[in-house]
Amino acid sequence: MNTVKPESIALFCLTPGGVRLAKRLAAMLPLTCYTSEALQEEGFIPFNGGFASAAREVFSSFSALIFIGATGIAVRVLAPLVNDKLSDPAVVVIDERARHVISLLSGHAGGANALTRYLAGMLDADPVITTATDVNELAALDTLAFQLNARMTDFRAAVKTVNQMLVSGKRVGLWCDGEFTGALSRCDRRGFIPVSDLARLPALDALICVTLRRSLPPLPVPHWKLVPQRVVAGIGCRRDTPCALLSTLLDRQLAAQRLDPLALKAIGSVSLKANEPGLRQLAHRCRVPFETFSAEALREHEHRFPASSFVRETVGVGSVSGPVAWLLSQGNLSGETLREQGVTITLGVTH
């Protein structure tokens, strides 16, 4: 899943007019600008082996690519590189007179539609966006998911089904747990029908539920959970603890707090465990970052948790999982620490 960040945008220009427009844009937002050797100026990187070669080289390295020139040229160059709308970068094309800004690739998931609107506003140009939900002035489920940094089971199929329902005029409800009311109010919800009480649903064809809950009560309509990634897990373990055991215990701890595994945002441990195979494999399996903290950083918070002299002698701090979860969640812990088979797991929920 790709999210456009202003500091990770590459821009390609092929003509003198394109260079002038690139300099205009570079004065307003951070860009890495590429052009031919013949047109190179200060602040521009020359193509390495030509335009197509340079584009291929950076395609997976930036969150977004801007091409100043003909759409057809961009299509021909990028066609062999396109892989998946959930991971490909946003691609936007601008004509060198800055009359039109075109969202070409990864409109929702990559953020190309949002970038197109932003650039068009800066340039007083016409944004050209062709995704069905946008042209019908509706929100899209994949956009909502990325705005909330949320996951779903079978995300691709859910997005296809729900977006088609929205475009077809079906009644798709949108409900959230109270803790997400503020975040949801800042999201694009056009076309969704607000739902405040799961026990008193209006007439609906489908329902989206924004929640961290592991399970929901029985509902009379087709529904999908949209699960924001908010849960963090501090983990302490003995050397060479198998990933399978860590995974089983983590799932048990999440279940004890009635939290959906999709809500996991990060796992962490002490720096001494930075290369612990089981922990690294667990992070990879859960598709989350593995973050580590120095013993010194953890000692600042170990007074909040029961300490072990053995752990202190081994890693330099009397408690690992609690202080790690405290740091990852800014002190917003959830439930009791699991202690089993040489493993400790403490959960927290980020804001």
Label each region the model flagged.
Residues 14, 18-24, 30-31, 39, ...:
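Conserved mixed alpha/beta catalytic, RNA-binding, or beta-rich assembly cores of soluble enzyme
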Residues 68-69, 317:
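Short, conserved micro-motifs enriched in small and acidic residues
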Residues 252, 262-323, 329-333, 339-343:
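C-terminal non-catalytic interaction/assembly regions of soluble proteins
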